[in-house]
Amino acid sequence: MALEAYRHLLRATRIAFNGDIAILTSARNQARSTFLTNRSLTPESPESIAAIAHAEDVAKFLRHNVVQGQKAEGDEKYKLNIHEHTERGDNDTIKMPSGKNVTIDGKTCKD
């Protein structure tokens, strides 16, 4: 399970940081050092299971929520690297009148 999570994390860094060698290298080094730190954990231990779940969550977040952009030369606009895995919202909350609270699963942003 740990090897699979590690591979998912490396693939997610490649997708999220494609073309940015410095950030890609840093993210992969961070993943490697974290996995090496947890290397001594037994596969069935709660700490190991939690670490693997965390790695999978980070991989999912990188794949779906991280988008890099580059500033266009001579312009104030940015070109975003939106890829097939990027989560796209419908922006329904923007259309809500001012003063309304958004409730998701019974919780608001204040909770």
UniProtKB/Swiss-Prot annotation:
Q: Which GO terms describe its cellular component?
A: mitochondrial matrix
Q: Keywords in UniProt for this one? A: Chaperone, Mitochondrion, Transit peptide
Q: Where is this region: Disordered?
A: 88-111
Keyword Transit peptide present in the record's keywords: the answer is yes
Cite the residue span of the transit peptide: 1-48
Q: Any keyword Chaperone?
A: yes
Where in or outside the cell it occurs: the entry states:
Mitochondrion matrix
* CDD domains linked: Complex1_LYR_LYRM7 (cd20267)
GO-annotated biological processes: mitochondrial respiratory chain complex III assembly
Q: Name one GO molecular function term.
A: protein folding chaperone
Instruction: Output the PANTHER family linked to this UniProt entry.
Output: COMPLEX III ASSEMBLY FACTOR LYRM7 (PTHR46749:SF1)
Q: Which family does it belong to?
A: Belongs to the complex I LYR family. MZM1 subfamily.
Oligomeric and partner information? Interacts with RIP1.
Q: Give a short account of what the protein does.
A: Assembly factor required for Rieske Fe-S protein RIP1 incorporation into the cytochrome b-c1 (CIII) complex. Functions as a chaperone, binding to this subunit within the mitochondrial matrix and stabilizing it prior to its translocation and insertion into the late CIII dimeric intermediate within the mitochondrial inner membrane. Modulates the mitochondrial matrix zinc pool.
Q: What is this protein called?
A: Mitochondrial zinc maintenance protein 1, mitochondrial
